[in-house]
Amino acid sequence: MDHREKSDRRLLLWFFAVATAVKLLLIPSSRSTDFEVHRNWLAITNSLPLTKWYFDETSQWTLDYPPFFAYFERFLSIFARLVDPRIVDLQSGLDYNAESVIYFQRISVIVSDLCLLYGVYRLTRKLEPLKRNLICALVIWSPGLLIVDHIHFQYNGFLLGWLLLSISFLQEGRDLLGGFLFAVLLCFKHLFAVTAPVYFVYLLRHYCWSGLVTGFRRLVTIGAVVVAVFAAAYGPFIYHGQIQQVISRMFPFGRGLCHAYWAPNFWVFYIILDKGLAVLLRKLGYEIQIPSASFTGGLVGDSSPFAVLPQITPLTTFAMVLLAISPCLIKAWKKPHSGLVARWVAYAYTCGFLFGWHVHEKASLHFTIPLAIVAVQSLEDAKHYFLVSIVSCYSLYPLLYEPQEYPIKVLLLLLHSVVMWLGFAAQYTDYKAQKKETSEIKSKFRIGCFEKSYLMGLIIVEIVSQFLHPYFLGDKLPFLPLMLISTYCTVGIMYSWIWQLRKILT
């Protein structure tokens, strides 16, 4: 190992150490229902035999992730039992919130982020120092990950680490290993399958399309690898005749099109249009039955139909996502370049976020993290990432609704914006050329008028939602701030989708 590589690793560890210190400080922060969800999964996998994992209904927070994540929870439960046996008790552990369970689960997320650290390391180890350091800062210090994983509570950093590892191997031309890791990721969390068509087309064209004999051998090889991964995950449940129950838990379509807090996607406009038309038609004398205001509360069977516009089914959203991804698939087939994989993956997840079924706002991390890798490739990519990462982070604000958390989320976004600005300004400044012409050094990193105006609009939205609404309306129209945030952020995400599509087509 040369001196440069040692220095790079030390700097990466410094980034991770700073992030870890912040995460430790966030341990006492408030927790979402996801905290109890994962505690209950620890109890299920530790207290029950495998054959009962996907049948247990002791709590409403039933196990609905793929088997590899269940195995992961089972592994964690071994240590949880040593820390406090009540953590993994199905009955007495319900809604258990002692310090032991809080610290154990928080620290388990922090430790699992080592997977993210290794993914970033593999992706950036061959880049020039400035680009590498910038990606490390954007990913490891991601405010979205801090909010979702280390306050709200989830394991997105761990899962995204698998995704980054997969992309890193594809970029190195090690397609078989990249495909293997992606298959493993799907068996941890099936929602990452949105980009599976991209992987399929790319691997078929780049890895298998090399002559009849060689191509067929490679196709059989990678097919066998994927089948082996899924057999390891689902084999025990197939053996016990429970695969249908597992699938029904993983795909609870009865939860409805949208989550309780509307994720900033295309369906926000569809819902608003439906409600607006319903009100208008009723005023015009038509008998229109207006359903309840919340399209879903997040539980199975808790969803509302549309009043005027056609009902949307899971099949409809699947078709729309596939149609939106299709230009990327065509590009991947015509030009299967490994350097474009991260861009295609990010675009596919953007499509899934915009047009998918029952999308959570947290899913924006699926495309903002890969886009951080893309951001260092060109000045235009940096400008785009600056906008979309701010919008994505701001759309997560409703997850933290406690008054004491307000300074935290504002500070995280402000610091992230400053880090991005300084990093991109340094990345896209030609010091040598400018020193020859003038003593004044100016960066090429400037965002356009639309981007400036839109970001200023975010400040206005926040002032209205956080201060003006409660001051003037009090408890009236409680849904208005969330609807305003979701609608305004949708504009930014739609802009990002169009920008990415244009970039892929050109």
Swiss-Prot record:
Keywords: Endoplasmic reticulum, Glycosyltransferase, Membrane, Transferase, Transmembrane, Transmembrane helix
Main enzyme class: transferase
Biological process terms in GO annotation: dolichol-linked oligosaccharide biosynthetic process; protein N-linked glycosylation
Pathway: Protein modification; protein glycosylation
GO CC, one annotated term: endoplasmic reticulum membrane
Enzyme Commission number: 2.4.1.265
Reaction catalysis annotation: an alpha-D-Glc-(1->3)-alpha-D-Man-(1->2)-alpha-D-Man-(1->2)-alpha-D-Man-(1->3)-[alpha-D-Man-(1->2)-alpha-D-Man-(1->3)-[alpha-D-Man-(1->2)-alpha-D-Man-(1->6)]-alpha-D-Man-(1->6)]-beta-D-Man-(1->4)-beta-D-GlcNAc-(1->4)-alpha-D-GlcNAc-diphospho-di-trans,poly-cis-dolichol + a di-trans,poly-cis-dolichyl beta-D-glucosyl phosphate = an alpha-D-Glc-(1->3)-alpha-D-Glc-(1->3)-alpha-D-Man-(1->2)-alpha-D-Man-(1->2)-alpha-D-Man-(1->3)-[alpha-D-Man-(1->2)-alpha-D-Man-(1->3)-[alpha-D-Man-(1->2)-alpha-D-Man-(1->6)]-alpha-D-Man-(1->6)]-beta-D-Man-(1->4)-beta-D-GlcNAc-(1->4)-alpha-D-GlcNAc-diphospho-di-trans,poly-cis-dolichol + a di-trans,poly-cis-dolichyl phosphate + H(+)
Database matches in InterPro entries: Glyco_trans_ALG6/ALG8 (IPR004856)
Membrane topology: Multi-pass membrane protein
Transmembrane regions listed in the UniProt entry: 10-30, 101-121, 133-153, 176-196, 219-239, 261-281, 305-325, 339-359, 384-401, 406-426, 454-474, 479-499
Cellular compartments annotated: Endoplasmic reticulum membrane
Transferase is among the record's keywords: yes
One term of GO molecular function: dolichyl pyrophosphate Glc1Man9GlcNAc2 alpha-1,3-glucosyltransferase activity
Protein function: Dolichyl pyrophosphate Glc1Man9GlcNAc2 alpha-1,3-glucosyltransferase that operates in the biosynthetic pathway of dolichol-linked oligosaccharides, the glycan precursors employed in protein asparagine (N)-glycosylation. The assembly of dolichol-linked oligosaccharides begins on the cytosolic side of the endoplasmic reticulum membrane and finishes in its lumen. The sequential addition of sugars to dolichol pyrophosphate produces dolichol-linked oligosaccharides containing fourteen sugars, including two GlcNAcs, nine mannoses and three glucoses.
PANTHER family reported for this sequence: DOLICHYL GLYCOSYLTRANSFERASE, DOLICHYL PYROPHOSPHATE GLC1MAN9GLCNAC2 ALPHA-1,3-GLUCOSYLTRANSFERASE-RELATED
UniProt similarity note: Belongs to the ALG6/ALG8 glucosyltransferase family.
Protein name: Dolichyl pyrophosphate Glc1Man9GlcNAc2 alpha-1,3-glucosyltransferase
